[in-house]
């Protein structure tokens, strides 16, 4: 299902909250600047989020198939209304279970985005902006100790052992 695939890719690929995802308007997407305007996110704050090339390509395919004019993800019953949260949550949960994932919802996609971006080296302040957190401490909650990455520091005593 092209709609579900696109919803998943945008949610995970941008780290959006479900309400931010479902309230994207076609005009909010700027393919040239590779951004999406998130209007009135949590706390009624607006921000721009960076969009990857793969997410933009998927959005273009989706647009060519569905031709949305207002809401990017509109209700199938009322095109002038955004899709409801349950219309995304239910098929996401169903497909995740079919893949063997026990707990998958839009927030777990957001959490995975944050964790994976930190693992790949995204600076904490950039992630804070992307996620729309007003307090850096909220973003820091996505930091996990990952033994496979080592501690990321240098050996401060390496030069001493040569003396």
Predicted regions and their residues:
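Conserved catalytic core of the tyrosine transesterase superfamily
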Residues: 1-163
């Amino acid at each position: 299902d092209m709609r579900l695939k696109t919803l998943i890719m945008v949610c995970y690929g941008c780290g959006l909250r479900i309400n931010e995802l479902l309230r994207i308007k076609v005009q909010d997407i700027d393919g040239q600047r590779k951004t999406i305007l998130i209007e009135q996110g949590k706390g009624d704050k607006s921000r721009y989020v960076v969009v990857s090339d793969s997410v933009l390509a998927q959005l273009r395919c989706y647009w060519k198939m569905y031709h949305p004019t207002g809401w990017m993800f509109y209700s199938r019953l009322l095109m002038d209304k955004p899709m409801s949260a349950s219309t995304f949550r239910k098929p996401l949960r169903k497909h995740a279970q079919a893949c063997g994932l026990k707990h998958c919802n839009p927030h777990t996609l957001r959490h995975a985005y944050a964790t994976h971006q930190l693992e790949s080296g995204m600076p904490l302040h950039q992630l804070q902006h992307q996620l729309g957190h007003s307090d850096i401490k909220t973003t820091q909650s996505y930091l996990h100790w990952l033994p496979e990455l080592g501690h990321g520091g240098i050996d401060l005593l390496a030069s001493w052992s040569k003396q």
